[in-house]
C-alpha cells in the first residue's frame, strides 16, 4: 500500500491565514451588515503598472502568430529578463552576476519553500523569531524541523533567534554552529531592517561556520534609508555563503501574475558526508529542470517591463502610495498610544498589543469592535506573542478609516 509522508502530519491543522479566514467568515455570517477592512494578509490592491500591461498585451499578440509563438521556455528563465535583472538590480550596486546564477520563478514563496530539496534532511536550522511561516513549515514537511513542543510552540531541531523590542529586533549571532539560517530583510512580519554592519556580522558568522544563509529580499524595493543593504551580496564574501530570493509580487503588484527570481552563486558550495564540496548552483539547476517548467513567456515579458524607464516610474508611484499608507497608519496608531515598529523601510507595521493583551485576543477585539482584520503576531512564532501585524497594501481610504475606527472604538 502507499504510505504518506508522515512529516506532514506534524504540521498544525491549518495554515495561519486559513485560521484568520475562518474567523473572518464566521464574523461575516453573524454580522452580515458590517463593513470589514482587511489589513492582514499582505496582498496588494493597486493595479499592475501600465508598462507591464502593455508588455503582456504585446506578448499575447505574439502567441497568435506561428512566427512569434512561444512554447516551452527555458526552466531558468528567458535571457531578456535575466539580463534586465542583473543590469538593474545588481550591477548598479557593484555586484557582478553571471546569467546562469539567476533563476526566474513563479514567486519567492515557491523557491523559499523548495530550496530544501537540495539540502540534507538532517541539517540544523536557525530562524529569526517571529518569522514567515513558510520557512518553518517547509522544513517540517521534509523532517528537518524535528518535533513540535506544543507548550513553547518551538520545533526541536530549529534554533529560534528572538527579535523583540528589547534587542531592537536585531537577532543575536548564535553561540553555536547552525547549518542553515533564514534571514528576511526588510523583515516580514516586523517591518524592521539590518544595517550593512549588522548584516556583515551574519556573513562573517556564516563564512566562519560553513553556514548557508537563505536571504529573502522580497521587500528591498521599499527601503528608504541609505545604510540599509538591498542585497546580501553587497557584503564581501556573501556569494560564498548565501542564496538570495527576490519577488515582483510587492514590487510591481505581481501577487496574481506570479514572478520572482532566485540567485544561486556559482562559488557557493555545500558538503557531502564524505566532505566533497558540491556547487549548489548545479544542484538547483538540476532540481528546476526536473520539477519546474519555467515561468510563462507572457509573465516574463511583463516582468521585463518593470525595468523600462516607464515601468520604473510607475512602480515607484505604487511603492510611494503604499509607503504613504504606512506613514498614515503608523501616525494614526501612535496617536492612540500604541507602540508601532516598522513601516519606514517596509510596508509592514508591527504593533504592540495594549495592556499585555494576547495576539489572538487583540485580533478578536479589532475584528469585533473596529471591524478591522490584522494578523496575530504569535502566528509568526513564539516571540510574536503580544503583537499584531498590519499591512500598508490597502486602499488609502480604507487605511484612513481603519485608523479612525481603531482610535474611536478600541
Curated annotation (Swiss-Prot):
Pfam families: Aminotran_1_2
Statement: the UniProt record of this protein carries the keyword Transferase: yes
Sites bearing N6-(pyridoxal phosphate)lysine, chain numbering: 250
Species for this entry: Bacteroides fragilis (strain ATCC 25285 / DSM 2151 / CCUG 4856 / JCM 11019 / LMG 10263 / NCTC 9343 / Onslow / VPI 2553 / EN-2)
Catalytic activity from the UniProt record: (2S,6S)-2,6-diaminopimelate + 2-oxoglutarate = (S)-2,3,4,5-tetrahydrodipicolinate + L-glutamate + H2O + H(+)
Pathway(s) the chain acts in: Amino-acid biosynthesis; L-lysine biosynthesis via DAP pathway; LL-2,6-diaminopimelate from (S)-tetrahydrodipicolinate (aminotransferase route): step 1/1
Residues where substrate binds: 15, 42, 109, 132, 188, 293, 389
Record flagged with keyword Transferase: yes
InterPro entries named among the record's database cross-references: Aminotransferase_I/II_large, DapL/ALD1, PyrdxlP-dep_Trfase, PyrdxlP-dep_Trfase_major, PyrdxlP-dep_Trfase_small
UniProt xrefs under HAMAP family: DapL_aminotrans_1 (MF_01642)
The protein's name in its UniProt record: LL-diaminopimelate aminotransferase
A single GO BP: lysine biosynthetic process via diaminopimelate, diaminopimelate-aminotransferase pathway
Alphabetized UniProt keyword annotations: Aminotransferase, Pyridoxal phosphate, Transferase
EC number: 2.6.1.83
Residues in coiled coil: none
Family stated for the protein in its record: Belongs to the class-I pyridoxal-phosphate-dependent aminotransferase family. LL-diaminopimelate aminotransferase subfamily.
Subunit-structure text: Homodimer.
Gene3D superfamilies found in the cross-reference section: Aspartate Aminotransferase, domain 1, Type I PLP-dependent aspartate aminotransferase-like (Major domain)
Binding site for pyridoxal 5'-phosphate: 72, 108-109, 132, 188, 219, 247-249, 258, 293
Cofactor(s) in the UniProt record: pyridoxal 5'-phosphate
GO molecular function (one): pyridoxal phosphate binding
Domain of life: Bacteria
Gene that encodes the chain: dapL
Function field: Involved in the synthesis of meso-diaminopimelate (m-DAP or DL-DAP), required for both lysine and peptidoglycan biosynthesis. Catalyzes the direct conversion of tetrahydrodipicolinate to LL-diaminopimelate. Can also use m-DAP instead of LL-DAP as the amino-group donor.
Amino acid at each position: 500500500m502507499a504510505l504518506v509522508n508522515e512529516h506532514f502530519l506534524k504540521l498544525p491543522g491549518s495554515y495561519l491565514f486559513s485560521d484568520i479566514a475562518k474567523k473572518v467568515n464566521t464574523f461575516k455570517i453573524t454580522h452580515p451588515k458590517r463593513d470589514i477592512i482587511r489589513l492582514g494578509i499582505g496582498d496588494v490592491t493597486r493595479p499592475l503598472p501600465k508598462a507591464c500591461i502593455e508588455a503582456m498585451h504585446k506578448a499575447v499578440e505574439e502567441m497568435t502568430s506561428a512566427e512569434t509563438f512561444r512554447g516551452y521556455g527555458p526552466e531558468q528563465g528567458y535571457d531578456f529578463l535575466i539580463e534586465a535583472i542583473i543590469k538593474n538590480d545588481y550591477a548598479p550596486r557593484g555586484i557582478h552576476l553571471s546569467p546562469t546564477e539567476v533563476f526566474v520563478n513563479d514567486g519567492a514563496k515557491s523557491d523559499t519553500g523548495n530550496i530544501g530539496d537540495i539540502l540534507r534532511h538532517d541539517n540544523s536550522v536557525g530562524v529569526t523569531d517571529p518569522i514567515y511561516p513558510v520557512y518553518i513549515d517547509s522544513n517540517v514537511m521534509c523532517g528537518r524541523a524535528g518535533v513540535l513542543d506544543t507548550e513553547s510552540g518551538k520545533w526541536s531541531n530549529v534554533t529560534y533567534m528572538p527579535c523583540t523590542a528589547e534587542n531592537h529586533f536585531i537577532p543575536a549571532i548564535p553561540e553555536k554552529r547552525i547549518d542553515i539560517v533564514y534571514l528576511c530583510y526588510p523583515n516580514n512580519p516586523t517591518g524592521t531592517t539590518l544595517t550593512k554592519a549588522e548584516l556583515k556580522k551574519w556573513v562573517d558568522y556564516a563564512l566562519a561556520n560553513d553556514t548557508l544563509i537563505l536571504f529573502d529580499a522580497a521587500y528591498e524595493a521599499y527601503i528608504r534609508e541609505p545604510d540599509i543593504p538591498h542585497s546580501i551580496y553587497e557584503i564581501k564574501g556573501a556569494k560564498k555563503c548565501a542564496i538570495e530570493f527576490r519577488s515582483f509580487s510587492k514590487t510591481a503588484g505581481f501577487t496574481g501574475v506570479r514572478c520572482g527570481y532566485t540567485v544561486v552563486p556559482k562559488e557557493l558550495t555545500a558538503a557531502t558526508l564524505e566532505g566533497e564540496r558540491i556547487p549548489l548552483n548545479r544542484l538547483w539547476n538540476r532540481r528546476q529542470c526536473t520539477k519546474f517548467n519555467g515561468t510563462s513567456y507572457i509573465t516574463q515579458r511583463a516582468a521585463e517591463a518593470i525595468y523600462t524607464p516607464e515601468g520604473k516610474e510607475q512602480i515607484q508611484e505604487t511603492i510611494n502610495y503604499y509607503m504613504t499608507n504606512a506613514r498614515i497608519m503608523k501616525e494614526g496608531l501612535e496617536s492612540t498610544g500604541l507602540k508601532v515598529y516598522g513601516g519606514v523601510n517596509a510596508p509592514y507595521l508591527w504593533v504592540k498589543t495594549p495592556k499585555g493583551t494576547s495576539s489572538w485576543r487583540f485580533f478578536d477585539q479589532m475584528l469585533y469592535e473596529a471591524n478591522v482584520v490584522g494578523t496575530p503576531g504569535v502566528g509568526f512564532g513564539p516571540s510574536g506573542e503580544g503583537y499584531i501585524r498590519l499591512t500598508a497594501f490597502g486602499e488609502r481610504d480604507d487605511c484612513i478609516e481603519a485608523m479612525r475606527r481603531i482610535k474611536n472604538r478600541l
